């Protein structure tokens, strides 16, 4: 066994009744001595290195040519002067295994962590040497982390896109379906995750050109997509990933769910495609009242009304659809369907759930479109309009699909840095550069939306880590107080920066005029309420940090009314599971799954203690499976008030829970205004062992 693996494993060998957390730092040092230093290509100086990387097609040239060599050198000097050290073996291993640039045979390392940060900073700086240094400082302090596609690809010659995720509307014709599959493969090849709204597609047994029973339904399309994503990956570096969403009132809903049953036939089962169900309030109402529900055949709805089922306000239209004899429908028991979804989620983790009316009550751009579906991780929630792809030689009618480039603030390091304003504004600028430099020609509706909407998705990580290291329990009132203040402040500074960019460029996103931002409605909660700390503990945490007052929110509203916003969407909290290891941060805003994670790589086991874990804060690092999920819902609901898009909300379940227990959590989440529920993870309590006594 390699020395760094041995040292890492010694964490678990108790000494004086305690885990040896200090062994992880020794493992990092050994990893650098035995692997990183031995396998890093040596260059005499920076110029030789950059010349080699450009001449051998590792780095793009244009972004570097925008600077003088002295400016480039200053950025690299900034990152190396920070004397950054990985605090855990897992963080170092994750970076050098997954993110560092390597030679074409992948045997030698061409970038250290400082080099990757410098490269990203120069890319974001767009020729402004001083701004590039600011980006470098922000990222080497680990206050901001670009999402994996951006961090992996920025500045590289042979790369995928830097945008993290894409959402495609699918219209109801073979042209549209085949084009959606083609675009999905192109986007997957570029490193993005792709979700598709299948709610417009005819259900199984509907008519084609008045021939009854001719259609095959959504499952056949899902099978094609499943194979497409497995085939199209990013040069073997990143697997293709896709998701399909369906409205719960679509007649194929049961067949759709059956694709994830463990016992499903191979002709039906989708192996890698994720699935999500869009749930309007009306369905929840029918289930609560134990009334029968009707699901509808979407083509008959379109023929009767000229509007697609998923674009209707089901709450307003449901009774009319039920009573219209021209609309084909089928009676179901909504409670049984909720139970079926609960069983599936305990078995497979799917489906995701999007509470459509919770989303659209808060959505600021309903005048463009209601939100009809979400993305692969259920945090991107935007307006979209469907395209119509015609035969060759005829013009296509290009709508608005969705793209969102993501990045995350490391809460602990932002708080330590003392300026939420500085971190947020620079993060918004970095995300904006990626948005503006992205033009995906193979996906015309994505490219159009990116040009017009300029959507970004700033998120966060390390919430549980920060709380635990400051002696605050995740389920406590103080934790919710902290989250309320922090995310209200982040929201404020994203709006300020978007407003500043609108003033600097003289440009707003397409459709700003009809939005809740333009009317001022969006801002009302902030000057009607006070989002400053309410508990002594949280007041102390924010002691030296500027928090906006209700009066400052009113001033911001007036500035936005006068000059507009540059971005249609600003905030989205992704799960950021992989990249959080590089940051030595707890993932997203969710509680931890384990105090000490065990990972297997090849024939070796490695251990990852949570950031800053010690005997003193052990019990503040309470594991998610031991938490009251209703309190976790309360936390996410608190944060959701301040996030214009969504939060990737993972449910943590024990195998002793019943479907009734899960349905109670779902209904409580819906009641609290949660927008989406992501993957459901179930823990096998039969294998449970208690580590608490070994602290």
Language-model features: locations:
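Extended catalytic cores of very large enzyme megasubunits
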Residues: 1-695
């Amino acid at each position: 066994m390699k020395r760094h693996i041995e040292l890492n494993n010694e964490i678990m060998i108790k000494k004086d009744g305690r885990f040896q957390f200090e062994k992880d730092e020794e493992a990092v040092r050994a990893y650098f001595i035995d692997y990183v230093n031995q396998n890093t290509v040596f260059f005499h100086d920076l110029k030789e290195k950059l010349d080699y990387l450009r001449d051998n097609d590792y780095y793009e040239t244009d972004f570097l040519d925008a600077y003088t060599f002295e400016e480039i050198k200053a950025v690299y000097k900034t990152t190396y002067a920070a004397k950054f050290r990985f605090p855990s073996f897992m963080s170092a291993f994750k970076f050098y295994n997954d993110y560092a640039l390597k030679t074409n045979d992948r045997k030698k390392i061409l970038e250290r962590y400082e080099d990757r940060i410098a490269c990203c900073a120069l890319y974001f700086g767009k020729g402004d040497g001083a701004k590039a240094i600011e980006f470098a400082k922000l990222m080497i302090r680990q206050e901001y982390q670009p999402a994996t596609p951006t961090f992996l690809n920025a500045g590289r010659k042979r790369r995928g896109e830097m945008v993290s995720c894409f959402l495609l509307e699918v219209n109801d014709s073979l042209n549209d379906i085949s084009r959606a599959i083609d675009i999905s493969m192109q986007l997957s090849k570029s490193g993005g995750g792709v979700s598709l709204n299948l709610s417009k597609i005819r259900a199984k047994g509907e008519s084609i050109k008045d021939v009854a029973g001719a259609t095959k339904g959504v499952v056949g399309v899902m099978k094609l997509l499943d194979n497409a994503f497995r085939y199209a990956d990013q040069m073997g570096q990143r697997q293709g990933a896709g998701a399909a969403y369906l409205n719960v009132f679509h007649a194929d809903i049961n067949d759709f769910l059956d694709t994830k049953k463990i016992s499903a036939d191979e002709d039906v089962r989708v192996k890698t495609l994720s699935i999500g169900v869009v749930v309007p309030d009306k369905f929840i109402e029918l289930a609560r009242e134990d009334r029968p529900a009707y699901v509808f055949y979407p083509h008959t709805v379109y023929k009767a009304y000229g509007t697609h089922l998923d674009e209707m306000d089901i709450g307003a239209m449901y009774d009319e659809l039920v009573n219209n004899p021209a609309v084909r429908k089928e009676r179901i028991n909504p409670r049984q369907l909720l139970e079926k979804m609960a069983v599936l989620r305990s078995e497979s983790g799917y489906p995701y759930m999007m509470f459509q009316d919770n989303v659209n009550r808060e959505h600021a751009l309903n005048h463009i479109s209601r939100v009809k579906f979400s993305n692969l991780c259920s945090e991107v929630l935007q307006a979209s309009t469907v395209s119509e792809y015609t035969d060759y030689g005829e013009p296509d009618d290009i709508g608005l699909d969705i793209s969102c480039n993501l990045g995350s603030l490391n809460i602990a390091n932002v708080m330590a840095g003392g300026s939420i304003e500085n971190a947020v504004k620079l993060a918004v600028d970095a995300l904006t550069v990626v948005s503006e430099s992205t033009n995906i020609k193979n996906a015309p509706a994505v490219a159009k939306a990116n040009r017009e909407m300029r959507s970004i998705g700033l998120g966060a990580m390390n919430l549980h880590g920060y709380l635990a290291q400051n002696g605050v329990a995740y389920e406590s009132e103080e934790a919710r107080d902290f989250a309320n203040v922090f995310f209200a402040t982040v929201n404020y500074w994203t709006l300020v920066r978007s407003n500043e960019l609108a003033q600097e460029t003289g440009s707003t996103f397409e459709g700003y005029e009809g939005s809740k931002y333009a009317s001022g409605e969006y801002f009302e909660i902030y000057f009607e309420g006070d989002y400053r700390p309410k508990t002594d503990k949280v007041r102390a945490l924010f002691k030296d940090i500027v928090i906006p007052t209700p009066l400052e929110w009113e001033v911001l509203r007036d500035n936005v009314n006068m000059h507009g916003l540059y971005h249609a969407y600003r905030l989205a909290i992704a799960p950021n599971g992989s990249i959080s290891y590089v940051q030595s941060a707890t993932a997203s805003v969710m509680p931890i799954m384990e105090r000490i994670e065990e990972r297997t790589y090849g024939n070796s086991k490695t251990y990852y203690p949570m950031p800053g874990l010690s005997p003193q804060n052990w019990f503040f690092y309470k594991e998610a499976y031991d938490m009251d999920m209703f309190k976790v819902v309360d936390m996410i609901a608190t944060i959701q008030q301040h996030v214009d898009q969504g939060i990737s909300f993972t449910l943590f379940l024990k195998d002793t829970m019943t479907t009734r227990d899960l349905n109670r959590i779902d209904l409580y989440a819906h009641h609290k205004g949660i927008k989406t529920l992501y993957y459901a993870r179930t823990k096998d309590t039969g294998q449970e062992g208690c580590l608490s006594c070994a602290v």
